[in-house]
Curated annotation (Swiss-Prot):
Specifically methylates the uridine in position 2552 of 23S rRNA at the 2'-O position of the ribose in the fully assembled 50S ribosomal subunit. Keywords: Cytoplasm, Methyltransferase, rRNA processing, S-adenosyl-L-methionine, Transferase. GO terms for cellular component: cytoplasm. Its EC number is 2.1.1.166. The active site is at residue 165. S-adenosyl-L-methionine binds at residues 64, 66, 84, 100, 125. This is Ribosomal RNA large subunit methyltransferase E. It is found in: Cytoplasm. Belongs to the class I-like SAM-binding methyltransferase superfamily. RNA methyltransferase RlmE family. It catalyses: uridine(2552) in 23S rRNA + S-adenosyl-L-methionine = 2'-O-methyluridine(2552) in 23S rRNA + S-adenosyl-L-homocysteine + H(+). One of its GO terms (molecular function) is rRNA (uridine-2'-O-)-methyltransferase activity.
Amino acid sequence: MARSSHTSKSSASWLKEHFDDRYVQRSWQDGYRSRASYKLLELDAKDALLKPGMTVIDLGAAPGGWSQIAADKVGDKGCVIASDILEMDALAGVTFVQGDFTEMEVLEQILVALEGRRVDLVMSDMAPNMSGMAAIDQPQAMYLVELALDLARQTLSPGGRFLAKVFQGEGFDAYLKELRGSFRKVVTRKPEASRARSREVYLLAEGFHG
């Protein structure tokens, strides 16, 4: 089926932006799997998220940009469990669970992979397939971060942290309030590597208390 000229132009515009992106170019040079690596590096530099020996869950992990950073930071005595609906090439020090995180079976596989360990940091970079229609995309995005928070509540150690990509829009304020009910402190971050036109921000919740 032929695509419309508008779709073709939009795709061409996205590709040009992607290949011109300095973080994309840096990721090739530095050996990182995606430009998203720089978001986590910046957040870690500011908030000291990752330390040797930590147990970390990475949701929405493919192609592995965050897991790559996390595995390096937590070291051999740490543990990184990553999950995504998409395939992800193996990474040393990372246990990967492939599947749809909205399905109970995938959640159970993540819990099994933990082998009884409590988690120090749950990270979610999940996002739905965007249609460009806020009325559809925003509820789907909020549903994913709600599920991520549910997992964090099940697995975090007391005092643990939760980092999630959230899109500003309907449901954002209510979600922020919900986070504040389970954590001592919640801050909003917008990494430099996050595209300026994007509605995405990262909420960092610290001091989990249930």
